[in-house]
Amino acid sequence: MDNMVFLLIKFYIFFVILFLLGRAFIIINSKIFKLNFHEESKLQGIDIQIFYPVLGIFFLGNFLYIFNYFLPLKNKLSYLILLFIFINFKHPIYYEKLKGILKTLPIYIILLATSYDINFHYDAGLYHLNNQLWLLESNIVAGFSNIYGPYGVSSIYEYLSAFLWLDRSFMLVHFLSLVFIGFFYTFL
């Protein structure tokens, strides 16, 4: 039971970081493009707060892709993206508007059960983990798919996964998938 409580705490810290990165992304874009952003904004009739974690993933992934042109992802400077979280404190967060996010908590608790005794899929060892390790150790390599064909068809998800190699369990990589699955279930 202690392990599940630890996973729950770890997931919600991860979720809050993605939420704040997504909100910072919206705030930055509203300043750059002079948009009228406010917490009551809706996207196709849906509260914009629901989209913050996915936008945070988008923002983080694109930052890591650009960063990897110059430096490997294991460089400590890659964590500077987390400074964007402080942009949230310049604009107040209306906690009563976060009720929609709080309604998704049971969905994520149920999804966290998939984290118990999880193992790698066979193609993780075939090329995903090797590709992610390469992204961590070096900046972008021209002709990367000439080394091994599947390396050339990787996506921004590989950059995100490589960045999340913070512990030996690779649980944060699994949490990334849970955010997408939970986002899908919020619309059902």
Outline where the language-model segments fall:
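Short, aromatic-rich membrane-interface segments at the entry and exit
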Residues: 73-81, 100-101, 123-127, 173-174
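Active-site lumenal/periplasmic loops and adjacent helix-entry segments of GT-C-fold
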Residues: 112-188
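Residue-identity detector for glycine
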Residues: 22, 45, 56, 61, ...
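Glutamate identity and glutamate-enriched acidic tracts
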Residues: 39-40, 96, 137, 158
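Membrane-embedded, hydrophobic transmembrane alpha-helices
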Residues: 1-95
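Internal/C-terminal transmembrane anchor helices
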Residues: 100-115
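Short hydrophobic/aromatic-rich motifs at helix boundaries and adjacent loops
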Residues: 38, 100-104, 129-134
